[in-house]
C-alpha cells in the first residue's frame, strides 16, 4: 500500500518523481503521469501493477515508469496473468464487496493480500493465458475507437 508524500513536495515538474495517487492517475490500464513529487515514500518499479484501493477500489493499471505510490494505491509485483486476474476480479465486483468506509469506499491491505487467485504452476502457461487476454483487451480497445 502506498504512503502519500508531504504535500509541500508536490510539483508540476516532469523531471521529479511521478506520483500515483489513485484512479485519476490510471488511464486505459496504464499509469498516466499527472502529478510529480520531490519526495520518495513507497515506490513501484517499471512493469509493476498498480491497484486503486480507494473509490473505485480495484481499478487496475500497469506502470511503464518508476513511480511513487500515494495512499490511494497499492503496488503489486506480478505478470500479465496476475494483472488479467485482478481486472477480472474487479469486473466481477469482488473488490466492491470488500470495500468499506464512511466517506468513500476503500479496501485495506488484508483484502488485497488475502485475495485468492488460482495461478497455473507453469510460468509459460501463465504467460500464454495472460498474453491471450491482453490480446483480447487490445482488440476491444481497437474496436471502441
Where are these regions (language model features)?
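Amphipathic alpha-helical segments
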Residues: 116-145
